[in-house]
């Protein structure tokens, strides 16, 4: 069972259990704990770290000041849900062995794919499965249309549309990685509440990346999911569900890199809008807008090292020591309802100073980062929260 494809099984084996108290056995227990952690689809760069928590602290990168600009929440990303349990397939982790097909299942998935023009593909298919040892079944007709187009200046446009008519009463329970705010991440059991028992569902996704002039980049992302149960509203309520559920998320980003002398000034802006009505009645409806403005300054100091031929106005010089200063301000408008981590309107600001030094030592590249961070968050009707952090990290590697 290796759903995250990292070469380590996710089951706990008897010979990894800590039966005693010596150091070797304790180390074995640590390995066993790590084997139970899995985040399929969230390590696309293959570095064995969660792409949404690269620094391994108690905050996902999409919640952390400055890092949040590069990291978008997984619920804004596109993917197919072919087992109709409400979770994108590429993010799923279960406790089942990785057989070519699920045990106790019989059936087929047949589809036809046509490339209409280069970059534009259309798929239509039929899914039919049943349980061998029971009365469960899955039947669906579905379509998928995708379009990828290159834009000028290295830009790219991606569009995807997916829809399905589903009848599915086979539960596909999961064991998923969850990263709460200010708490260690953990694996939790996620029950399939059968949102595709008898339903129509549609997904629409689009993202576009553009370069406008020298040093200016913008990015837009849109995701819309809609599901309509074909049973009555009362029947849906009896199983703690809603007849109509949806998710609408829009992300806009812009950044500008401005060379000033040897330094670089980087203004950034990010906006995140989400409107969500989950299938489960245990989770409330919510609508919110969150925006951040970031200003970063990087100033080279001290010795300079040039790894390639450098000509003025063509390329960037590399400096062994850099001073980085940044400030981020953000605001959350909770328009309707509430969701986890967003119960009230809030404002925040964060300031950081970091000194980065890079040097070579016996064939290794050693990077040292030292700095401090101040943060204040004002929550409407609940006062303010202040936090300060002093940090120092040392990283050694063979690659520059």
Positions of predicted regions on the chain:
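Acidic, glycine-anchored loop motifs typical of Ca2+
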Residues: 2-96
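Membrane-embedded beta-strand positions in outer-membrane beta-barrel channels/transporters
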Residues: 107-113, 142-146, 201-207, 247-255, ...
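Outer-membrane beta-barrel strand-turn architecture
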Residues: 114-118, 147-153, 165, 198-200, ...
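Transmembrane beta-strands of outer-membrane beta-barrel proteins
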Residues: 118-124, 153-159, 216-220, 252, ...
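Eukaryotic acidic, serine/threonine-rich low-complexity intrinsically disordered regions
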Residues: 122-204, 209-226, 234, 245-246
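Transmembrane beta-strands of outer-membrane beta-barrel pores
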Residues: 126-132, 161-167, 222-230, 258-260, ...
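Outer-membrane beta-barrel "beta-signal"
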Residues: 385-400
